[in-house]
Amino acid sequence: MKQLKYNIENMKHLLLLLSVVLLMGCQNQNRKDGQEKLSESTKPVQEKTFVELGGEKQYVEMTGASEDLPVMLFLHGGPGWPQTPHLRYFNADLTKQMILVSWDQAGCGQSYKHNPNPENLSPESLVNDAHELTQYLKKRFNKEKIFLVGFSYGSVIGMKLAEQYPDDYHTYVGVSQVISVSESWDVSMQWLKEKAQQKNDATALMQLDLIEKKDSTVCATILDCFMSKYELVLKYGGTVYDTAIAKEIEKAETMYEDYKNYDWFEAFNYTSARMDGVAFTTDISDITELKIPVYFLGGRHDWNLPSVVAENHIN
């Protein structure tokens, strides 16, 4: 594996990690829409709007205690699985330190509700849309650069942005960073086999055998194959380690009026079909050098996207 090289100047950006950890926070801050009562001397940012990206209106939510704060663009994963309600629910403290920007990418969330059949929806269009959004944010808040965070498949978009447009960003942070889906798949499958053998789970072992053989009963499509494995990862606690947090995540997805009746899997399946399952074959291991500071945050109990794959990429 080639070594990913980092420009580690401006190490003050390490402070960003203290904020970014809040993105995966484990407790609700109990503030309406993630905001405390603000001082009259500040000009807070609390905007929910549609921005034209790639020729189509897409939903963007910007929240911060002051327009003077640094801007952080959060790229959700899936593709087709928005994080806006989760960011509202878990991340009140972050909006005191930064202007947190949540974008529902084309084909999901409020963007999907506004336009359920976007003309452009591909890995390339997502990167292009994110680049356009970056330019919009820089102009809107008069910033030379912004901070960039990519989560799960959003980390694929993030790495490509950081590689192609380093002058736009202070720092890139990959949360559950995707490097090679096939390598992550192999590590995840090996973990599942060990778990199933330890528990003498004959049913799980049989399902794993069918998945490996790409049997049509579980792998009619590449998405079906992924979901068949995901069910087992979920069963053994390899997605959300703490069951109490799983309940909080479910609560976040249903408590806000604008997402209360949102069909998460309808949009996810739509996006997967439109993108021909490309998310499940992604490999960006050829990105071996970035010109900005980069940080990877991985969960030691994450066996959907095992952190060891990203760790190996930089060692």
Model-derived regions: residue spans:
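Conserved acidic catalytic loop of the alpha/beta-hydrolase fold
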Residues: S125-K145
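Conserved alpha/beta-hydrolase "acid-adjacent" motif
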Residues: W303-V309
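A catalytic-pocket lid/entrance helix-loop region that shapes and gates access to the active site
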Residues: D167-D215
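The serine-hydrolase catalytic nucleophile loop
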Residues: P79-N91, V308
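Conserved alpha/beta-hydrolase
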Residues: L94-K113
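Alpha/beta-hydrolase
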Residues: A202-S285, I292
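Short beta-strand element of the alpha/beta-hydrolase
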Residues: L69-G78
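Short beta-strand/loop motif that positions the catalytic acidic residue
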Residues: L290, F296-G298
